[in-house]
């Protein structure tokens, strides 16, 4: 009986063995192929129990895929039930609940396990799960303190706490700064020229293609000497600043003289005539120095508020 079983399983697995004759260098692929071969042996044994002597490779692969999907779904649902009850490791009760939810009659499982025609399959070779190498290791990994249960997930790798600044120090080299300023100025001039050529009137060097090498049209001024007579913006700004500062000083002087005259008003009422060695007040001196002709007086501009 054992010889027939081994022959049946060998004939069923002949296609899979021939297909996987190539050696895999990756430990992950070796681990997956070992699990896949075990499922194929189980499927072959079940087919032999049902009375089949041989089977096609496509049929064995289909049944193996169905069994793998069923086992994967049982494990996934058991893990979900386990996490729903605030646990990290599934137990037998989680698997039983999963089988019941999937429509499996759990009471028939002991009877099926004690059947007389059950075939004994040798244990597969022990294959260790592939270990994922850690490329970045820095420092020592932290352990859980006393107030954190052991079933909680571990702390992240110490490398995750390392930060790298993303900003760069400003360049202080004279040559690099000048080259950068020159390139920026060139880009600004080129962009301004293109904008003026697109929005304003242009002249073309070629009659056939007007859009090729456009030139900004020169607009002659009706009064060419006007630009030489008008002050520039910098001169206007400096004049406004000086005028505003002079007006502030004049207002401060007027306020000071008014306060002094108010303080001395009591003494001036008693002595209407100044003593021979007296000094003329500054207010009267300013009034005498004022020009009567309004056309000769200096222009008073409004006070300009400086932006802070």
Swiss-Prot record:
User: What GO biological process term is on the record, naming one?
Assistant: transcription initiation at RNA polymerase II promoter
Q: Which organism is it from?
A: Danio rerio
Membrane-spanning segments: none
Provide ranges: composition bias, Basic residues: 298-308
Q: What keywords does the record list, in alphabetical order?
A: Cytoplasm, Developmental protein, Differentiation, Nucleus, Phosphoprotein, Transcription, Transcription regulation
User: Subcellular localization, per the record?
Assistant: Nucleus; Cytoplasm
**Coiled-coil regions listed in the entry:** none
Which Gene3D superfamilies does this one have? Histone, subunit A
Q: What is this protein called?
A: Transcription initiation factor TFIID subunit 8
Residues with PTM Phosphoserine: 26
- The record's region (Disordered) falls at 1-29, 239-308
Family label: Belongs to the TAF8 family.
Q: Which residues form the Histone-fold domain?
A: 37-104
Which Pfam families does the annotation name? Bromo_TP (PF07524), TAF8_C (PF10406)
Q: Name one GO molecular function term.
A: protein heterodimerization activity
Q: What is its main location?
A: nucleus
Lineage from the top down?
Answer: Eukaryota, Metazoa, Chordata, Craniata, Vertebrata
Q: Where is the composition biased (Low complexity)?
A: 8-21
The UniProt regions of compositional bias labelled Acidic residues, in chain numbering, are 239-252
Role summary: The TFIID basal transcription factor complex plays a major role in the initiation of RNA polymerase II (Pol II)-dependent transcription. TFIID recognizes and binds promoters with or without a TATA box via its subunit tbp, a TATA-box-binding protein, and promotes assembly of the pre-initiation complex (PIC). The TFIID complex consists of tbp and TBP-associated factors (TAFs). Mediates both basal and activator-dependent transcription.
């Amino acid at each position: 009986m054992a010889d027939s079983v081994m022959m049946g399983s060998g004939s069923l697995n002949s296609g899979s063995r021939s297909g996987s004759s190539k050696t895999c260098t990756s430990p992950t692929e070796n681990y997956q192929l070992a699990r896949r071969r075990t499922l194929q042996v189980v499927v072959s044994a079940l087919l032999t129990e049902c009375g089949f002597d041989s089977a096609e490779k496509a049929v064995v692969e289909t049944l193996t895929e169905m069994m793998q999907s069923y086992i994967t779904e049982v494990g996934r649902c058991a893990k979900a039930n386990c996490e729903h009850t605030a646990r990290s490791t599934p137990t037998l009760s989680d698997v039983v609940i999963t089988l019941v939810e999937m429509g499996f009659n759990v009471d028939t499982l002991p009877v099926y396990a004690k059947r007389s025609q059950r075939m004994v399959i040798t244990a597969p070779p022990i294959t260790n799960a592939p270990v994922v190498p850690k490329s970045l290791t820095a420092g020592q990994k932290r352990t859980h303190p006393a107030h954190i249960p052991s079933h909680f997930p571990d702390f992240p790798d110490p490398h995750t706490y390392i930060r790298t600044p993303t900003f760069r120090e400003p360049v202080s080299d004279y040559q690099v700064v000048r080259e950068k300023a020159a390139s920026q100025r060139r880009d600004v001039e080129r962009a301004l020229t293109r904008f003026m050529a697109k929005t304003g009137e242009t002249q073309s060097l070629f009659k056939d293609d007007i859009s090729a090498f456009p030139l900004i049209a020169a607009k002659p001024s009706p009064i060419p000497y006007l630009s030489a007579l008008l002050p520039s913006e910098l001169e206007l700004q400096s004049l406004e600043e000086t005028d505003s500062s002079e007006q502030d000083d004049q207002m401060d002087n007027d306020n000071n003289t008014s306060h002094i005259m108010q303080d001395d008003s009591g003494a001036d009422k008693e002595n209407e005539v100044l003593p021979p060695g007296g000094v003329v007040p500054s207010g009267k001196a300013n009034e005498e120095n004022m020009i009567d002709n309004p056309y000769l007086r200096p222009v008073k501009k409004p006070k300009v508020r400086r932006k802070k």
